[in-house]
Amino acid sequence: MTLKLHDLRPARGSKIARTRVGRGDGSKGKTAGRGTKGTRARKQVPVTFEGGQMPIHMRLPKLKGFRNRFRTEYEIVNVGDINRLFPQGGAVGVDDLVAKGAVRKNALVKVLGDGKLTAKVDVSAHKFSGSARAKITAAGGSATEL
């Protein structure tokens, strides 16, 4: 027997009929699951209504401030991280930091001055803090902004 389009039926239990309320005296008849009397039985009330209690959206504090849409976010790398990832020194660029897993790809990189630097490194990044620039130059390296 070949399968025809008119023989197709949805899987059992996948389609559940919508409960029709207020039709006769059955389980969802008469009061239709609304109880007896009161506002909720006679008309709809908002979902947020809590029966005279102070609603949750008014109990919570308001959010202050704003989020600047034009802020530039930088991935942070400390001088100590560079020292740990590149102990031999040399030229360190953003691509090298991505390859070592220190920063994400296509991210702007800022170098901060936390930690010690022992090897001479020539770092190129998008931004440097003053202390990071001082530590890199003190170790004999150079800090180049992209």
From Swiss-Prot:
Extract one GO molecular function annotation from the record: rRNA binding
* Family annotation (PROSITE patterns): RIBOSOMAL_L15
Q: Which GO terms describe its biological process?
A: translation
UniProt KW Disulfide bond keyword: no
Query: Is Transferase one of the keywords?
Result: no
Which InterPro entries does the UniProt record give?
Ribosomal_uL15, Ribosomal_uL15/eL18, Ribosomal_uL15/eL18_sf, Ribosomal_uL15_bac-type, Ribosomal_uL15_CS
Q: Which UniProt keywords apply?
A: Ribonucleoprotein, Ribosomal protein, RNA-binding, rRNA-binding
Q: Bias regions of kind Basic and acidic residues — which residues? A: 1-10
- GO CC annotations? cytosolic large ribosomal subunit
Which intervals of the chain are annotated as region Disordered?
1-41
Per its UniProt entry, which superkingdom is the organism in? Bacteria
The entry's function note states: Binds to the 23S rRNA.
Q: Which HAMAP family match?
A: Ribosomal_uL15
Question: Subunit comment for this entry?
Answer: Part of the 50S ribosomal subunit.
Q: Which PANTHER family match?
A: 50S RIBOSOMAL PROTEIN L15, LARGE RIBOSOMAL SUBUNIT PROTEIN UL15M
Similarity remark = Belongs to the universal ribosomal protein uL15 family.
Protein name, entry field:
Large ribosomal subunit protein uL15
Gene from which the chain derives: rplO
